[in-house]
Design a protein with these regions (language model features):
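DUTPase catalytic domain/fold
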Residues: 1-177
Length: 177
């Protein structure tokens, strides 16, 4: 069986770096990535998204938008002939978020190809006038390729492996109002 890194069967690869030497989160992503990538080889209809874990218990306030850093940095590339081209990707709510009072405040995150900062969700609360707790390792969001095609995922040990860009870590309005 060909390795996923030798012959890209899929057009896109997502590279993930777990921040702050969080070994437990790293192990969770490692397990999730192994399962995700095995599905690319065995499932004729693999998932379009890759779930993102909330890295720590978080109190969400009902009176404001809640910024929740996901504890990972990412880069996505598109495989074109003999080269890999950086590309943007999407951060979508998982369908199961509808069973909670959490809502992704901007509905979908568009992550530009040059962004190398921490992946972050901005949430507000609906249907409640009280703060709520989001438990550690809850999966509220998923990363999707620009075309919603399945993609392979690679866990990297160093955020330098994601490549440096002119933009780097600027996000949420950093390029203009």
């Amino acid at each position: 069986m060909a390795s996923l890194t030798q012959q890209p069967r899929y057009k896109y690869t997502l590279f993930i770096h777990v921040c702050d030497n969080n070994q437990e989160l790293y192990n969770m992503y490692n397990t999730k990535i192994e399962h995700h990538n095995s599905q690319l080889l065995t499932n004729t209809h693999p998932d379009s998204g890759f779930d993102v874990f909330v890295p720590k218990q978080t109190i969400m306030k009902h009176t404001s938008v809640n910024k929740v850093p996901m504890g990972i940095k990412c880069a996505m590339v598109k495989h074109k002939s003999s080269q890999d081209v950086p590309c943007g990707y999407y951060l979508y709510p998982r369908s199961s978020i509808s069973k909670t009072n959490f809502r992704l405040a901007n509905n979908v995150g568009i992550i530009d190809s040059g962004y190398r900062g921490v992946v972050t969700g901005m949430f507000d609360l609906i249907y409640t006038n009280q703060e709520e707790t989001c438990d550690i390792y809850t999966r509220l969001l998923q990363i999707c390729s620009p075309t919603l095609e399945p993609f392979k995922v690679v866990l990297v040990n160093d955020d330098n492996s994601l490549g440096s860009t002119q933009r780097n870590t600027g996000g949420f309005g950093s390029t203009g109002r």
